[in-house]
């Protein structure tokens, strides 16, 4: 021990407890100082000037020990209807990023081939806040220590509840929103488990704020593996992919026979994945192999190079993947550059660990959710094969809940299929009974909103109860069995002056509530730390004066230019001196903010953030391996 260190130790011996307590509080203060403003996305490269879109993005730690962080991307609603609503969107995989949903499906923007962002007609942020989350840990921009990946659905749901608790601490005014979950494919497993976890959490007592879960939507869901496996060959026959009585059909039927044996032996209604049954779909795809082409399993109207067979689809992926790797984009989204997470559409490491061997399939949770009063909407794109509509329709037909089977209205009487006409075109059909709604989209793929943003938005607004008759705007012409439902707007933004004034009042109220809630917590921590610090300094000075020492701070040997945590804390809030988490930004701030338009030239001049080769190839090697597993759905 050197002279200065020894002197400091003698000077502050007996103060280690005080020092430990203070440092712990200082650390807590630094953590609590992380606020919504730190996540604010000022602009994105290539973002259009209008309409203004308020966004927040970044990582939230859900487990310090394993460095488990989930990435979120929040998009605020353009307008508030009768009440605020938040839709949480999850893509599937397992291990596929929800940026697919954000930039190719329901989000406000699509990426062009010159790295600009175009606004999407029919995006879901018109009357609902959107929250995209990369989960489980390790998916997309999320990260976790090696070996700490999630393997079961219950564990995934528990981690997601932890994420929501921390997210609502940052954005407290959203905690009182009506809450909906939406997603597709393997999210058909995620979402019912998360819904179950939320309903169970709400029963734990009055100390917790009850989250107002109002419904879930699942598109082309991997919900009942048994029904889906058994639907592959009937779907192939129905769509003319395989002809009965041919050598092709015999080869596929042989694979199906092995699958049936496995299903019967294991009685595996309670199994999420059966490798022997995965071979049925692969056999069908192999029968379409001609030259170097094969059928696209996500949209059977298309072909792809063999053996991708749909893995290169949708075409927007070619633009989106490099965009999400540009340094200026990752910086705008507050990606933790120290972790070098990069971005890939699907993670082989996540899917390799997430086998759900001990988890029952989510179809077994649906009856209980429905009977507890949770509305559920299942929708299917007609031209998807991997999670095709026959499998989902069969699971509904066999499911029992609330005293009936399937869409029974009474014993032997089923709810009719109601024709859906959207803006003069036959769009599909609706069928509903006892809290469950099913929608089939004609001529749509595995990713319905990719094909039909306005139609999918109309479905959402109808499900969550938006009626623009109260706020102004041009309603869409959408009719079910010839009858118009609530007025919904899928293109034109409401322009009612009265609506704008009402919305401004709601924004102001929500903003101040958010300030009060987050401010109270920070004030308490600051007050406690200040009191302890003051007592510590006073007692130390008294002791030192008695001993003839001069007080110079906690670590006098460091001199006056300390780089400790407290000086850094003064800059934690970044460029803004206040929290910008409220539903919308002050009009004055919008006026002062520079234009968000970034020219194609300036966007291209930015150095791309490339994971892997200099050519910016799409994904790492484990991604292609993962997507070859047919159970892995985007």
Curated annotation (Swiss-Prot):
Annotated Gene Ontology cellular component terms: membrane; trans-Golgi network
Region called Disordered, residue ranges: 475-502, 592-634
Residues linked to a glycan: 118, 328, 435, 443, 495
Record membrane topology: Single-pass type I membrane protein
Residue stretches of biased makeup (Basic and acidic residues): 625-634
Reactions accelerated catalytically: Preferential release of a C-terminal arginine or lysine residue
Top EC class for this record: hydrolase
Active site: 185, 384, 446
Single GO MF annotation: serine-type carboxypeptidase activity
Pfam families: Peptidase_S10 (PF00450)
Location within or outside the cell: Golgi apparatus, trans-Golgi network membrane
Residues in the Lumenal compartment per record: 34-517
Biased amino acid composition, Acidic residues: 612-624
Main location: Golgi
GO terms for biological process, alphabetical: apoptotic process; proteolysis
InterPro entries: AB_hydrolase_fold, Peptidase_S10
Keywords: Apoptosis, Carboxypeptidase, Glycoprotein, Golgi apparatus, Hydrolase, Membrane, Protease, Signal, Transmembrane, Transmembrane helix
Transmembrane segments: 518-538
Signal sequence annotation: 1-33
Family assignment from sequence similarity: Belongs to the peptidase S10 family.
Physiological role: Protease with a carboxypeptidase B-like function involved in the C-terminal processing of the lysine and arginine residues from protein precursors. Promotes cell fusion and is involved in the programmed cell death.
Name this protein carries in UniProt: Pheromone-processing carboxypeptidase KEX1
Organism encoding this protein: Ajellomyces capsulatus (strain NAm1 / WU24) (Darling's disease fungus)
Lineage, highest ranks first: Eukaryota, Fungi, Dikarya, Ascomycota, Pezizomycotina
């Amino acid at each position: 021990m050197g002279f200065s260190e020894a002197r400091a130790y003698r000077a502050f011996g007996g103060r280690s407890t005080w020092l430990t307590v203070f440092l712990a509080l200082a650390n807590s203060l630094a953590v609590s100082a992380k606020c919504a403003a730190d996540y604010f996305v000022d602009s994105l490269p290539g973002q259009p000037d209008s309409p203004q879109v308020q966004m927040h993005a970044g990582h939230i730690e859900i487990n310090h020990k394993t460095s488990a962080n989930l990435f979120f991307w929040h998009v605020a609603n353009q307008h508030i209807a009768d009440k605020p609503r938040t839709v949480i969107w999850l893509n599937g995989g397992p291990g596929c990023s929800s940026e697919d949903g954000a930039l190719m499906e329901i989000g406000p923007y699509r990426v062009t081939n010159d790295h600009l962002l175009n606004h999407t007609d029919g995006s879901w942020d018109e009357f609902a806040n959107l929250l995209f989350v990369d989960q489980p840990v390790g998916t997309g921009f999320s990260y976790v220590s090696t070996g700490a990946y999630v393997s079961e659905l219950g564990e995934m749901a528990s981690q997601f509840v932890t994420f929501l608790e921390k997210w609502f601490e940052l954005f407290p005014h959203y905690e009182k929103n009506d809450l909906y979950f939406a997603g597709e494919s393997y999210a058909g497993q995620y979402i019912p488990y998360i819904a179950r976890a939320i309903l169970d959490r709400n029963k734990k007592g009055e100390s917790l704020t009850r989250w107002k879960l109002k419904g879930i939507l699942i598109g082309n869901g991997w919900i009942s593996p048994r029904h889906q496996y058994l639907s592959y060959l009937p779907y192939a026959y129905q769509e003319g992919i395989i002809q009965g009585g041919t050598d092709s059909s015999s080869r596929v039927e042989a694979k199906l026979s092995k699958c049936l044996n496995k299903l019967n032996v294991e009685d595996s209604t309670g199994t999420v994945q059966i490798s022997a049954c995965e071979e049925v779909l692969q056999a069908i795809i192999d029968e379409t192999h001609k030259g170097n082409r094969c059928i696209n399993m996500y949209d059977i109207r298309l072909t792809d190079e063999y053996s991708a067979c749909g893995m290169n689809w949708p075409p927007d992926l070619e633009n989106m993947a490099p965009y999400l790797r540009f340094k200026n984009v990752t910086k705008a989204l507050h990606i933790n550059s120290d972790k070098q997470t990069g971005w890939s559409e699907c993670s082989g490491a996540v899917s390799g660990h997430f086998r759900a061997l001990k988890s029952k399939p989510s179809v077994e949770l649906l009856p209980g959710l429905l009977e507890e009063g949770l509305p559920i909407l299942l929708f299917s794109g007609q031209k998807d094969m991997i999670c095709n509509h026959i499998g989902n329709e069969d699971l509904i037909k066999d499911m029992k809940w609330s005293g009936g089977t399937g869409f029974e209205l009474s014993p032997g009487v089923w709810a009719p299929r109601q024709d859906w006409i959207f803006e003069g075109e036959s769009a599909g059909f609706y069928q509903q009974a006892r809290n469950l709604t099913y929608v089939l989209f004609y001529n749509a793929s595995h990713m319905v909103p990719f094909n039909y943003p306005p139609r999918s938005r109309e479905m959402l607004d109808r499900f969550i109860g938006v009626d623009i008759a109260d706020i102004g705007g041009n309603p869409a012409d959408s009719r079910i069995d010839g009858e118009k439902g609530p007025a919904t707007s899928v293109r034109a933004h409401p322009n009612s002056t009265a609506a704008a004034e009402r919305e401004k009042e709601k924004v102001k109220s929500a903003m101040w509530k958010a300030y009060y809630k987050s401010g109270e917590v920070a004030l308490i921590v600051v007050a406690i730390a200040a009191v302890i610090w003051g007592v510590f300094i006073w007692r130390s000075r008294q002791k030192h004066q008695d001993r003839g020492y001069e007080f110079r701070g906690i670590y006098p040997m460091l001199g006056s230019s300390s780089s400790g945590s407290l000086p850094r804390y003064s800059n934690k809030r970044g460029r803004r001196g206040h929290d910008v988490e409220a539903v919308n930004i002050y009009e004055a701030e919008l006026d002062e903010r520079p234009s968000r338009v970034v020219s194609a030239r300036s966007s291209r001049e930015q150095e791309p953030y490339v994971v892997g080769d200099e050519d910016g190839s799409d994904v790492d090697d484990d991604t292609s391996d993962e997507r070859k597993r047919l159970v892995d759905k985007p």
